[in-house]
Amino acid sequence: MKLDNTSKEIILKKSEFLLHNNFKLIEITDSTITFSNKKIAFVIGYERHDNVSNINIKFLQENKMFNLGWIAFVRRNQMPLPQNKLDNILELLDYAEKNHAKVTNLQFCQDSREMVEDFLK
């Protein structure tokens, strides 16, 4: 699914906190918006062939990527996220802004992945 121009504008506005935290807008494609500070990348996007949206956090030097949707889910006591693609992205950006120091910490993300794996067992 493509990001329409209105959604892109809304997402870019909601992502301004990343710019204030020394991230730069790196790329905008039909389905993703990417911010990076050369160590970590936030890849915000819609799945190409599905009605799903998500934000991935990639630790570039370590070459490790984490799904912010799952992190938010397990860290917020399994509170479900909105089903609307744009609302889901905005909710995840809000979570990332409020928990910026945590979600940009590799250990926090790794611990969250373990929580997800335990949840899925």
Residue ranges and their predicted role:
Residues 18-19:
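Hydrophobic strand positions within the blades of repeat-based beta-sheet folds
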Residues 1-13, 25-121:
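Intrinsically disordered, low-complexity regulatory regions enriched in serine/threonine/proline
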